[in-house]
């Protein structure tokens, strides 16, 4: 392989600060290492990113010293491109992946070790976890699923910068959608324009999230199809861009054609409720406080019989 020049998403100093925070937690818990399987954890801690993140890959973060990455051989370029690590183990499609993984863990941590692992990671199957444990008989295991995810909750200035860029792309996508909300255009027409505008505005992701109209606009998680907009249609749209996988998204209803006075009054009420809730969002305040403002006010408006959706969940 030709020499690859790394293109890190963040500075080397920021990555080292993240590893130091993880290692401090590892030492506080009197562990020898944390093994991270969540793709978000691997990328946040080491920088390593590939769109093939659904394959069997993880990072070993010892209590001190350099981390070690295990992944598929076709991803070696991305280790070199997105990280500064020279310590990694590769497997190929013909290999016994778990055997290679166990040997890699043992090479870093020795024959006996006390280790936390992300047991909740969707990329670590029950079968593979059992097999790893069976091969490393001198190891003691515990769940470490919250170690990195808790650290990721508070964003650095550099992370927020990416989220702001994603937020700008989200706004541009929504503005483009509003211009397309006229009779005769289709959901597919709107999706194409929204995707184009978000990419041009800086998003690394093309598609909108929810985009549905007519009857389907009243129900969550609808995707676009060839339905043609009609006068008085309601459209439900969520723009979901990301920059370096840092997300910003929002959802809005759009009406095709002219709104009535009653429609305007409802929208004004919703904006007022939103503003009242957002005023309460500040450090040290429980999410239940602004949540109750939304929940109780919307139910009191009488526009829905129940409101079970969660609010204020993290998407960073």
Predicted segments, located by residue:
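Active-site neighborhoods and metal-handling regions in enzymes and metal-associated proteins
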Residues: 1-316
């Amino acid at each position: 392989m030709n020499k690859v020049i790394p293109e890190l998403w963040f500075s080397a100093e920021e990555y080292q600060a993240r590893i130091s925070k993880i290692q401090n937690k590892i030492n506080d818990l009197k562990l020898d290492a944390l093994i991270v399987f969540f793709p978000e954890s691997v990328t946040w801690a080491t920088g390593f990113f590939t769109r093939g993140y659904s394959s069997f890959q993880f990072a070993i973060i010892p209590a001190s010293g350099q981390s070690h990455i295990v992944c598929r051989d076709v991803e070696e370029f991305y280790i070199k491109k997105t990280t500064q690590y020279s310590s990694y183990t590769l497997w190929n499609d013909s290999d016994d992946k778990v055997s290679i993984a166990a040997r890699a863990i043992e090479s870093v941590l020795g024959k006996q070790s006390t280790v936390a692992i992300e047991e909740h990671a969707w990329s670590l199957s029950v079968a593979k976890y059992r097999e790893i444990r069976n091969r490393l008989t001198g190891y003691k295991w515990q769940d470490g699923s919250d170690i990195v995810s808790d650290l990721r909750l508070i964003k650095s200035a550099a992370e927020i910068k990416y989220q702001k860029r994603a937020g700008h792309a989200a706004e541009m996508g929504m503005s483009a959608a509003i211009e397309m909300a006229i009779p005769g255009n289709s959901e597919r027409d709107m999706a194409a324009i929204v995707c184009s505008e978000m990419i041009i505005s800086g998003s690394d992701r093309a598609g909108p999230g929810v985009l549905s109209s007519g009857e389907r606009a009243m129900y969550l998680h609808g995707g676009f199809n060839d339905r043609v907009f009609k006068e008085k249609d309601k459209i439900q749209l969520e723009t979901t861009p990301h920059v370096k996988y840092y997300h910003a998204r929002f959802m809005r209803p759009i009406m095709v054609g002219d709104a009535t006075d009653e429609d305007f009054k409802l929208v004004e009420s919703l904006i007022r409720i939103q503003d009242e809730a957002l005023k309460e969002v500040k450090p040290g305040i429980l999410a239940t406080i602004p949540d109750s403002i939304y929940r109780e006010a919307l139910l009191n408006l009488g526009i829905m019989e129940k409101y079970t959706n969660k609010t204020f969940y993290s998407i960073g």
